[in-house]
């Protein structure tokens, strides 16, 4: 039902996967109480042309992400985390640490999931960039309407392929077509690939921090440096 165990009456027989090492079970249970499962409707365009031409070849899909609020009441800014090629359930430990730190600052966290709603269980790389970006803009639409979220303080971050989502959702034309008058308040792409860009390099005038590793040879830094120079 999600990334965490929701019900298990045989705790003594439970074997915790190595990737969850360091996450204490009482903290997991505490976080489970804070989860709001949030549905958002998206599409699966095979290319950006489908978005630009408003001509989609696939049916709508309903995805479900996890919203972690610091408290059940109140209105909060939110950081939306978009996963990369790997399934988000594989990053529970890292997400838990981020959630914990964000909640100290009274900031909510939303974790997107582009795979489960599409019934994808392997070969995640087959989901293209256009579909992932559409998912990101759909999350923006949904979070903007949530009663506990400050619609003017929705930030986005992502890693690798998710970093490209955090980058491409800053393009004005895509925002206009999918999210109308809504925008993210801040962007933090982490080692995105900048080798795929639009001819018009202009992005919206919002803060963006792009993080890279100097010797990364998978998502080369130089591509993003050259893009910024444009």
Where are these regions (language model features)?
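Serine-hydrolase catalytic machinery in alpha/beta-hydrolase-like enzymes
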Residues: 56, 61-63, 78-143
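Short beta-strand/loop motif that positions the catalytic acidic residue
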Residues: 204, 210-212
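Alpha/beta-hydrolase fold active-site loops
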Residues: 77, 185, 207
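N-terminal cap/lid segment of alpha/beta-hydrolase-fold proteins
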Residues: 16-73
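Primarily recognizes the serine-hydrolase "nucleophile elbow" in alpha/beta-hydrolase
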Residues: 130-204, 217
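Short alpha-helix in the alpha/beta-hydrolase fold that links the catalytic acid
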Residues: 220-229
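Short, solvent-exposed loop/turn elements at domain surfaces
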Residues: 3-5, 45-50, 89, 197
């Amino acid at each position: 039902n999600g990334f965490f165990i929701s019900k298990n009456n045989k705790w003594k027989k439970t074997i915790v996967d190595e990737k969850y090492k360091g996450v204490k079970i009482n903290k997991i249970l505490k976080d489970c109480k804070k989860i709001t499962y949030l549905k958002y409707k998206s599409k699966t365009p095979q290319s950006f042309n489908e978005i630009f031409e408003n001509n989609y070849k696939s049916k709508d899909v309903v995805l479900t992400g996890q919203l972690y609020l610091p408290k059940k009441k109140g209105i909060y800014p939110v950081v939306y985390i978009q996963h990369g090629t790997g399934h988000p359930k594989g990053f529970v430990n890292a997400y838990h640490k981020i959630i914990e730190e964000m909640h100290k600052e009274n900031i909510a966290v939303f974790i997107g999931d582009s795979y489960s709603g599409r019934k994808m269980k392997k070969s995640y790389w087959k989901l293209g960039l256009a579909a992932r970006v559409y998912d990101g803009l759909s999350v923006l639409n949904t979070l903007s309407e949530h009663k506990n979220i400050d619609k003017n303080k929705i930030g986005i971050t992502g890693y690798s392929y998710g970093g490209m989502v955090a980058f491409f959702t800053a393009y004005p034309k895509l925002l206009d077509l999918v999210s109308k008058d809504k925008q993210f308040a801040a962007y933090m792409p982490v080692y995105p690939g900048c080798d795929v860009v639009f001819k018009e390099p202009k992005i919206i005038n919002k803060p963006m921090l792009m993080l890279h590793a100097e010797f990364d040879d998978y998502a080369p830094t130089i591509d993003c440096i050259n893009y910024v120079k444009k």
